[in-house]
Regions:
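Cell-envelope and extracellular/periplasmic
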Residues: 1-191
Length: 191
């Protein structure tokens, strides 16, 4: 979800002012500071990341909501990681065997993307209301039968840590191409 595609001119212009992003880390190249809101011009995750599913998801939301509604996102993501990196009970063990490049990304979140997400979520609640949680994971964990339970655990902990009600704050899961059309990373629909 961090975004790998290089943003083009059409991606960085005419971003609606009502579509905001909160930086979960300092982004000096972009002139963004941690826990501050900005118009959601990519990159939305960290400096050096690209266009992500969040970019156009948020723009579509804004276009389909009343003019007085602002949509804000917090993008905490680590490309190529398994879901265990977002489970605070497993993150340290996961990082102990991870590649150096992944460890370097995790360091930007103080080695806990989950805690970074909670901290940013609490800051966001000072000025807004969390209406949903987005999860988009690529091919990591494909075929892992425990993936749905791992996601459920993280989602329920996130709801608890942020004082949210699951009946009011859905988990929306993006998916790589599913198996019905030849995709090989299909497993999200079972959560």
């Amino acid at each position: 979800m961090e975004g790998n595609a290089r943003p083009e001119a059409q991606d960085t212009s005419n971003v609606p002012e009502r579509f905001k992003m909160m930086a979960a880390v300092d982004m000096p190249q972009s002139g963004r500071k941690k826990f501050e809101w900005y118009t959601a011009v990519p990159p939305l995750c960290r400096d050096g990341t690209g266009l992500s599913p969040c970019d156009y998801f948020g723009r579509e939301m804004v276009q389909n909501l009343p003019d007085q509604v602002t949509v804000g996102i917090i993008n905490v993501a680590v490309a190529g990681c398994g879901i265990d990196l977002f489970d605070d009970d497993k993150a340290a063990g996961y990082l102990s065997t991870a590649a150096d490049w992944l460890k370097n990304i995790a360091r930007q979140y103080d080695n806990s993307p989950y805690k970074a997400l909670v901290a940013a979520g609490k800051k966001a609640q000072e000025s807004g209301v969390i209406k949903g949680i987005l999860l988009h994971q690529g091919e990591s964990n494909t075929g892992d039968q425990n993936w749905p339970n791992n996601v459920k655990k993280i989602y329920e902990k996130l709801l608890s840590d942020l004082g949210l009600n699951g009946a009011e704050v859905p988990l929306l899961i993006g998916e790589v191409v599913d198996s019905s059309v030849g995709g090989l990373a299909d497993r999200k629909s079972v959560v």
